[in-house]
Regions:
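Active-site-proximal, substrate-binding regions of enzyme catalytic domains
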Residues: 2-172, 181-198
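Conserved SAM-binding loop
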Residues: 176
């Protein structure tokens, strides 16, 4: 059996990287998995600097909490359905510890932030401080991420603008990693941002 061939990789154009909420969501917010462990090693070795924004963190917090609440409700439903079937067999009902989905979500959030700060040494960019006028000008001009009719990409627009301002003020460039085409297109409008598809 032949060994798999690795495609050569190009060196990074910058060591600064921003991961969109979608990247974390796609990993089910498990930032201890193998790809994130590899990222942590790159950060530890000084090859990568991870950036996030206040908006991204708020989105992750909300989504983590929603996921935990949904999972707790699903667990209750599964136990109830299982016990209905078990009644037919004469088996005793299964008891499962009641899980407070909201509390679980908050604990998951605290763990997520702990890893993000301690292991990934993430730098936070304040997107909520971007003047709204800048984003609304893009919106009214129909520029990315608002180039599609009916687009509601306001959080992404603030994020991209904040990252571009951060890069300009620090004279750096930054990869913007996302599976969201509109966010990547908006990032591509700025010389300092390098869109990268996840």
């Amino acid at each position: 059996m032949a060994k798999p061939v690795r495609n050569p990789t190009e060196p990074l154009r910058t060591r600064h990287v921003f991961l969109d909420t979608e990247v974390y969501r796609r990993a089910a917010f498990n930032i201890s998995n193998t790809p994130f462990a590899l990222l942590a090693k790159q950060i530890e070795d000084g090859r990568v600097v991870l950036h996030t924004t206040d908006i991204t963190l708020t989105e992750i917090h909300r989504q983590l909490k929603e996921t935990a609440v949904a999972m707790a409700a699903e667990a209750k439903r599964l136990v109830r359905d299982f016990n209905r079937i078990a009644q037919l067999t004469g088996e005793d009902n299964v008891t499962v510890r009641d899980v407070d989905g909201s509390a679980l979500g908050e604990k998951a959030w605290a763990g997520f932030v702990d890893v993000l700060v301690k292991r990934f040494r993430s730098h936070s960019v304040l997107a909520l401080e971007v003047p709204a006028r800048i984003v609304f000008d893009r919106y009214f001009d129909g520029r990315p991420p608002f180039d599609h009719r009916g687009s509601k990409e306001f959080p992404d627009a603030f994020i991209v603008e904040a990252l571009a301002r951060y890069c300009n003020s620090n004279e750096i460039s930054m990869y913007v990693v996302s599976g969201d085409a509109a966010l990547r297109k908006a990032a591509g409008e700025h010389d300092t941002l390098l869109p990268w598809r996840h």
